[in-house]
């Protein structure tokens, strides 16, 4: 376990994480949070071989610098929560991690000492998407870009010793202080940056309205680049563009009167830019000139251009309209006439931006003299746009074919569903018929069983009658035999009578057993009928 005040080593990391893999370049994620027993204060060369590391967690430690991780070019997530990073110099090496997407510096002294550290990190790491568990928004990127680009311009101009005394008075320290005042009120929650910057702009609005900014610098490109050295008002304008739009009418009225100052400065001497008021910082006061180009299909033309149609420039433009190379035929689409046709969106809406682009190019070409270079440029542009239109039309045809295939598949599915439904109906009908036949068979068997029972009863009754009749006839025969037999045969009669009495007893027993058997069968039949 590491001790407070001692750096860690690669062997310590292996023992800490029980890492037995030889090639440390295969490690993608590493978590080394601090504990009460020991905290990391210096990394040293312990992460030298973790070259493919993408996630690193060093939270709850005592790091005073981030040296030792600048070689991790593939690092995407870095957690430095609750460490001892006190200044921007301590985190300066983070700008080498250009693939970094998530960074956490909360509860570090640098967060309180340098409130504009977010702008620095957003400007230094372009791919940063989340800082201190909050997303990096486009407004912060714009503010960082304006702030640090102006700082670079001021530094380069200071080295050339071109600024005058009033330029040195407004140094980068004042701008940094202004940014600090704004960023102090900037909350990390969504949507609070507008309120904070609006509050800052209201506090400094009265003081700025009384000041006049005058900055002169050499410009090799153009005297109209009014945003080379933006101030705090420019950053506020980025966040509060809606407020600027409300007052655009008042600013546009005052702008033409000041455009002559720019022209006079451009003619008098070297190129220079002069900011007279915050209005000119936000809106350019250069007047633009344009030439109206009428569409060949239009029937209505402005009254101010009716007398110019006979000029050679207009004749050349009309001739160019007839050229199929410069103006190829556009695709048209015919739709079915329906009652709700007005509610449907028209096809080919993609033609509008292309037509606007063509009109802009025509205006650009008509303002200058005719030369072969502009003509060939316009021809190439038209050819490219026609190719784009063909590609889009091909895409629409493909969509139509896909729609037709979808309709066919839907129709086929409907047919299959109908067939399946008919088969189900047939099967249900057959099942119902089978149930009815089973019911009929059950009724028939029940009736047959009832008939069998009735016949059994009749048979038993008939057997009873027969037995009774036989039992009645036996004594009469005995009496007749006694009268007819002579006396000498009395002994023999007695013997025969005894034999007959024994046979009658056996016969009676057999009849009784038969009756009992029939009764048992009858009971079994009745029980079977009751169970069914």
Swiss-Prot record:
Question: Which UniProt key words apply to this protein?
Answer: Coiled coil, Cytoplasm, Cytoskeleton, Leucine-rich repeat, Repeat
User: Does the keyword section mention Transmembrane?
Assistant: no
Q: Which GO terms describe its cellular component?
A: centrosome; cytoplasm
Residue ranges of the LRRCT domain?
Answer: 108-147
Name of encoding gene: cep72
The function of this protein is: Involved in the recruitment of key centrosomal proteins to the centrosome. Provides centrosomal microtubule-nucleation activity on the gamma-tubulin ring complexes (gamma-TuRCs) and has critical roles in forming a focused bipolar spindle, which is needed for proper tension generation between sister chromatids. Involved in centriole duplication.
The family note in this entry says: Belongs to the CEP72 family.
What GO biological process, any one, is recorded here?
A: spindle organization
Q: Where in the cell is it found?
A: Cytoplasm, Cytoskeleton, Microtubule organizing center, Centrosome
Report the coiled-coil segments. 385-532
Q: Where are the LRR repeats?
A: 52-73, 74-95
Q: What is this protein called?
A: Centrosomal protein of 72 kDa
Q: Where is this region: Disordered?
A: 247-268
């Amino acid at each position: 376990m590491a001790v407070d005040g001692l750096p860690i080593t690669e062997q310590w990391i292996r023992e800490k994480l029980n890492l037995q893999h030889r090639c440390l370049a295969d490690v993608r994620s590493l978590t080394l949070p601090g504990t009460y027993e020991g905290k990391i204060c210096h990394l040293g060369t312990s992460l030298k071989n973790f070259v493919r590391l993408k996630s690193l967690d060093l939270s709850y430690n005592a790091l005073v610098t981030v040296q030792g991780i600048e070689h991790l070019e593939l690092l995407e997530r870095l957690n430095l929560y609750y460490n001892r990073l006190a200044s921007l110099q301590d985190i300066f090496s983070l700008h080498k991690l250009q693939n970094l997407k998530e960074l956490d510096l909360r509860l570090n002294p640098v967060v309180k000492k340098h409130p504009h550290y977010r702008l620095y990190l957003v400007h230094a790491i372009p791919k940063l998407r989340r800082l201190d568990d909050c997303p990096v928004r486009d407004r912060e990127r714009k503010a960082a870009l304006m702030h640090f680009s102006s700082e670079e311009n001021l530094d380069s101009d200071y080295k050339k010793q071109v600024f005058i005394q009033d330029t040195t008075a407004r140094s980068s320290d004042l701008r940094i202080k202004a940014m600090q005042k704004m960023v102090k009120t900037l909350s990390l929650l969504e949507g609070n940056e507008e309120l904070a910057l609006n509050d800052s702009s209201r506090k400094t609005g009265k003081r700025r309205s009384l000041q006049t900014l005058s900055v002169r610098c050499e410009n090799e490109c153009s005297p109209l680049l009014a945003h080379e050295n933006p101030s705090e008002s420019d950053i506020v304008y980025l966040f509060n563009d809606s407020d600027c739009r409300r007052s655009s009418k008042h600013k546009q009225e005052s702008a033409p009167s000041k455009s002559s100052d720019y022209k006079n400065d451009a003619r008098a001497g070297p190129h220079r830019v002069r900011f007279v008021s915050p209005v000119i910082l936000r809106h350019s006061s250069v007047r633009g000139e344009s030439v109206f180009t009428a569409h060949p299909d239009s029937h209505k033309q402005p009254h101010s251009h009716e007398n110019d149609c006979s000029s050679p420039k207009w004749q050349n433009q009309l001739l160019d309209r007839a050229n199929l190379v410069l103006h190829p035929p556009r695709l048209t689409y015919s739709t079915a006439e329906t009652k709700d046709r007005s509610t449907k969106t028209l096809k080919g809406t993609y033609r509008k931006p292309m037509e606007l682009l063509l009109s802009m190019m025509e205006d650009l070409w008509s303002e200058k003299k005719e030369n072969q270079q502009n003509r060939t440029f316009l021809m190439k542009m038209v050819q490219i746009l026609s190719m784009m239109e063909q590609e889009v039309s091909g895409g629409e045809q493909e969509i139509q074919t896909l729609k037709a295939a979808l309709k066919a598949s839907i129709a086929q599915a409907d047919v299959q569903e109908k067939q399946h439904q008919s088969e189900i109906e047939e099967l249900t009908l057959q099942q119902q018929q089978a149930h009815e036949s089973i019911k009929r068979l059950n009724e028939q068997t029940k009736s047959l069983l009832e008939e069998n029972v009735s016949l059994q009863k009749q048979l038993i009754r008939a057997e009873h009658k027969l037995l009774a009749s036989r039992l009645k006839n036996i004594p009469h025969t005995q009496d007749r035999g006694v009268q007819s037999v002579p006396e000498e045969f009395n002994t023999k009669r007695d013997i025969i009578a005894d034999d007959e009495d024994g046979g009658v007893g056996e016969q009676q027993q057999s009849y009784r057993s038969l009756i009992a058997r029939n009764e048992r069968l009858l009971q079994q039949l009745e029980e079977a009928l009751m169970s069914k």
